From Swiss-Prot:
Protein name, entry field: Dihydroorotate dehydrogenase (quinone)
UniProt keyword list: Cell membrane, Flavoprotein, FMN, Membrane, Oxidoreductase, Pyrimidine biosynthesis
Subunit details: Monomer.
Protein's UniProt keywords contain Membrane: yes
Major enzyme class: oxidoreductase
Pathway assigned to this chain's UniProt record: Pyrimidine metabolism; UMP biosynthesis via de novo pathway; orotate from (S)-dihydroorotate (quinone route): step 1/1
Family: Belongs to the dihydroorotate dehydrogenase family. Type 2 subfamily.
Source organism phylogeny: Bacteria, Pseudomonadati, Pseudomonadota, Gammaproteobacteria, Alteromonadales
Positions that bind substrate: 66, 111-115, 172, 177, 246-247
Enzyme Commission number, as recorded: 1.3.5.2
Length: 336
């Protein structure tokens, strides 16, 4: 009920202002007596994925808490894991505003943020200050100014920095808002990146005496042939997990709706069926050897169950959380 009232206020603001206001309030209240506003008990339903024990199967997708400022607040809402980022080696402003739009008719969101973040050092400071007892994933990307051909170096630099503080590392090569980034999903470019990441992972495992799994985050806009090729590479390089999927460039499901013509990635309910279909296709190729984290359009228990049935071991929410609030976390955790 409280969130419904809060939402009516937030939705009077433009989406990015609403986001920034929310982050600011959560940051102020987390760890204080005021966190009763959003703190809730959820059932303990531990699940083992990527060699980690997750308190439950519902996580916060990357992009909502880019700089890791509100980890404890989101933890208080019952998330079993929180994926912060996407973070880049150095701070960058992202694309020009306006860059986030609500597709209200279908509970969708279009964004072209462009990896706006305060840089990896700032994120690490926030992660170190967190008291969250669940799993923290750190989602890494490349800077806008780094040529795609040299993108591998940005990922390795971020990996070096975050490795001691992450429970898992998510490698984002699928945002549609950084020019050329999605080209890293294919062929030799993907194989070179995965090979370099695995070599560095082995070196860092020795250095820190701990193994931090790597999960690759992919786009939903893939042909069947591309899915087969990516799955083959994941298996060949023994990548620890797959996050499926990021936002879509497809607009078929929101034709004629508000802001449908805006450039950027579409998320929320319109993405549900497309992302679930991609998960099912990857599951058929990976045959249980690599776990899948399902994300895209989950805004109710049924949608979450569909992701699990398609082959996901965990689910993440973002847009559904914007539209439905913390109660969505509790509903899914307790009923999935």
């Amino acid at each position: 009920m409280f969130y419904q009232i809060m939402r009516s206020f937030l939705f009077m603001l433009n989406p990015e202002k609403a986001h920034d206001f929310s982050i600011k309030q959560l940051k102020l209240t987390q760890g204080t007596a005021l966190d009763f506003i959003y703190r809730q008990r959820v059932q303990q339903r531990p699940v083992q994925v990527m060699g980690l024990t997750f308190p439950n199967s519902v996580g916060l997708a990357a992009g909502l808490d880019k700089n890791g400022e509100c980890i404890d607040a989101f933890g208080a809402m019952g998330f079993g894991h929180i994926e912060v980022g996407t973070v880049t080696p150095v701070a960058q402003p992202g694309n020009e505003s306006p860059r986030m739009f609500r597709v209200l008719e279908s509970d969708g969101i279009i964004n072209r943020m462009g990896f706006n973040n305060e840089g990896v050092e700032n994120l690490i400071k926030n992660v170190k200050e967190s008291n969250f007892k669940g799993v923290i994933g750190i989602n890494i990307g490349k800077n806008f100014s780094t040529p795609v051909e040299q993108g591998k170096e940005d990922y390795l630099l971020c990996m070096d920095k975050v490795y001691p503080y992450a429970d898992y590392i998510a490698v984002n090569i699928s945002s549609p808002n950084t020019p050329g980034l999605r080209s890293l999903q294919y062929g030799d470019a993907l194989n070179e990146l995965l090979a370099a990441l695995k070599i560095r992972q082995a070196e860092l495992q020795v250095k820190y005496n701990k193994y931090v799994p790597i999960a690759l985050k992919i786009a939903p806009d893939l042909s069947d042939q591309e899915i087969v090729s990516i799955a083959k590479s994941l298996l060949e390089y023994k990548i620890d997990g797959l996050i499926a999927t990021n936002t879509t460039l497809d607009r078929d499901m929101v034709k004629g709706m508000s802001h449908a013509g805006e450039a950027g990635g579409l998320s929320g309910r319109p993405l549900q069926n497309k992302s679930t279909a991609v998960i099912a296709k990857f599951a058929a190729q990976l045959k249980g050897e690599i776990p899948i984290i399902g994300v895209g359009g989950i805004d109710n228990v049924i949608a979450a169950k569909e992701k699990i049935q398609a082959g996901a071991s965990l689910v993440q929410i973002y847009s559904g959380f914007i539209y439905h609030g913390p109660q969505l976390v509790k509903n899914i955790v307790n009923n999935i």
